[in-house]
Amino acid sequence: SDLTPADEERVRAALPEVGLHFVFVDPAMFDGFPESKRYPRQIYYRIAAPLLLPDTLERILYLDADTVIINPLTQLYAAPFGDAYFMACTHTRKLLEKLNAARLGMDEAAPYINTGVLLYNLPALRADLDMERVRAFADKKQDVFLLPDQDILTALYGDRVHLLDSMVYNLSDR
């Protein structure tokens, strides 16, 4: 949201072989969301992505900036969603799922979503994603958040995630 036209031009010049489309994000969309120095409002962009991106897109793959890609992602990107909203990895065991469910006020435990590698089912999310619901949940639970974006996605959509093999798609030291 704070990129200037000059910034955009520098990025385009650095990557002439890549087609880029910049999306303006209205900061007002996130008014009232809890923020901190460590977790600014931009963390909510990945939650709101289905509403911010063109309707012509049916899926997107989000990768954290520190993700190292060593194999093609073609098979992952083309994988069928079934009724899942996301494909992602988890790095928690069953006991931690129960603790996270209690911490986040969930009725039932669900896998804790690691958002470092996140494939989105955009049509399904567009039909169900309610940013007011996200804002209300974030406001209510902000005092117990550990990783706000992951906490929100787990609590609100953890039952709609297709788990990926973390040894293949999101190996982590956590």
Each predicted region: which residue ranges?
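Short, P/G- and charge-enriched loop/turn segments at secondary-structure junctions
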Residues: 36-38, 102-108
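Short, flexible loop segments at the rims of nucleotide/cofactor-binding pockets, characterized by
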Residues: 36-40, 95-96, 140-141
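Conserved beta-strand termini and adjacent loop/short-helix elements that scaffold enzyme active sites
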Residues: 1, 23-27, 89, 164-167
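Short, charged/polar "capping" segments at the starts of alpha-helices
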Residues: 2-10, 97
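GT-A fold catalytic core of metal-dependent nucleotide-sugar glycosyltransferases
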Residues: 24-28, 42-96, 119-120, 126, ...
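Short, charged, surface-exposed secondary-structure boundary motifs
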Residues: 31-35, 95-100, 173
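Active-site-proximal specificity loops/subdomain of glycosyltransferases
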Residues: 7-53
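Catalytic core and acceptor-binding pocket of nucleotide-sugar-dependent glycosyltransferases
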Residues: 91-94, 110-174
